[in-house]
Amino acid sequence: MQVHERSHTGGHTCQCNHGSEKKAPATGKVHSEGGSARMSLLILVSIFLCAASIMFLVYKHFPQLSEEEREKIKVPRDMDDAKALGKVLSKYKDTFYVEVLVAYFTTYIFLQTFAIPGSIFLSILSGFLYPFPLALFLVCLCSGLGASFSYLLSYLVGRPVVYKYLSDKAIKWSQQVERHRDHLINYIIFLRITPFLPNWFINITSPVINVPLKVFFLGTFIGVAPPSFVAIKAGTTLYQLTTAGEAVSWNSVIILMVLAVLSILPAIFQKKLKKKFE
């Protein structure tokens, strides 16, 4: 892993220098890494502002709304917001089908790309607005694309930030990834179903520890389907819910755990067969 190699190289350099020469390169390296991290953060903020501008254009091209309806067009922060937003969108969905769909699609991807809370409510909302097959495909596609854009942002400009703030955690996860390298897609699916690692952490560290983008996208697309299934089904009874937690029952949790185990079983059997024939 690059994080590990980087620290190893730094340690080797320090051992080869003596006296005052030993401190100068280390200080220069700290300033260099700090500057790189700051520059990366500035670039990320610039990209975020550009994406926010696109979101504003989508909002401006939305159908003409009343003042009361405009106040409800916002990223939902709780179930009341989701209900209010669902009421407005359902009113315009049939007449302005494409506009509503594009607004939903871009908003979901925007939230996923920049790890902004609220996508769980959009998943629930999709079950209220659309037929189940379309809703499930939409949520999986938006999750896969949004996570992949987050991956690409980290690949292009986020590495210094990961090195500076998350290197220890990234090294630990890199070791896990190496153990599952032969069945990586199953491992990604397992992580997406289970809550063991935050999604934002998976997104930004995957390019640093050499998880291929194709595997990352497919693992995410498939892995988010089971939890999304639960949220979308809950969306059919949107107005009976008072919190997002009510969308998840004990039956749902058990089903998710079973699916998580099933996703990792091929890898377990593959390891056992490999040991048997060696």
Swiss-Prot record:
Indicate how the chain sits in the lipid bilayer: Multi-pass membrane protein
Renumbered to this chain, region (Disordered) spans: 1-31
Q: What are the protein's GO molecular function terms?
A: phospholipid scramblase activity
Known catalytic reactions? a 1,2-diacyl-sn-glycero-3-phospho-L-serine(in) = a 1,2-diacyl-sn-glycero-3-phospho-L-serine(out); cholesterol(in) = cholesterol(out); a 1,2-diacyl-sn-glycero-3-phosphocholine(in) = a 1,2-diacyl-sn-glycero-3-phosphocholine(out); a 1,2-diacyl-sn-glycero-3-phosphoethanolamine(in) = a 1,2-diacyl-sn-glycero-3-phosphoethanolamine(out)
Where does it mainly reside?
A: endoplasmic reticulum
Please tell me whether the keyword Endoplasmic reticulum is annotated for this protein.
yes
| Key words of the record | Autophagy, Endoplasmic reticulum, Lipid transport, Membrane, Neurogenesis, Transmembrane, Transmembrane helix, Transport
Q: Does the keyword Endoplasmic reticulum apply?
A: yes
Location in or out of the cell: Endoplasmic reticulum membrane; Endomembrane system
Gene Ontology biological process terms in this record: autophagosome assembly; nervous system development
Q: Which Pfam families would you find in this protein's record?
A: VTT_dom (PF09335)
| Superkingdom of origin organism | Eukaryota
- Give the matching InterPro entries: TM41A/B, VTT_dom
State the protein's purpose. Phospholipid scramblase involved in lipid homeostasis and membrane dynamics processes. Has phospholipid scramblase activity toward cholesterol and phosphatidylserine, as well as phosphatidylethanolamine and phosphatidylcholine. Required for autophagosome formation: participates in early stages of autophagosome biogenesis at the endoplasmic reticulum (ER) membrane by reequilibrating the leaflets of the ER as lipids are extracted by atg2 (atg2a or atg2b) to mediate autophagosome assembly.
The UniProt family comment states:
Belongs to the TMEM41 family.
Mind telling me what this protein is named? Transmembrane protein 41B
Q: Which organism is it from?
A: Xenopus tropicalis (Western clawed frog)
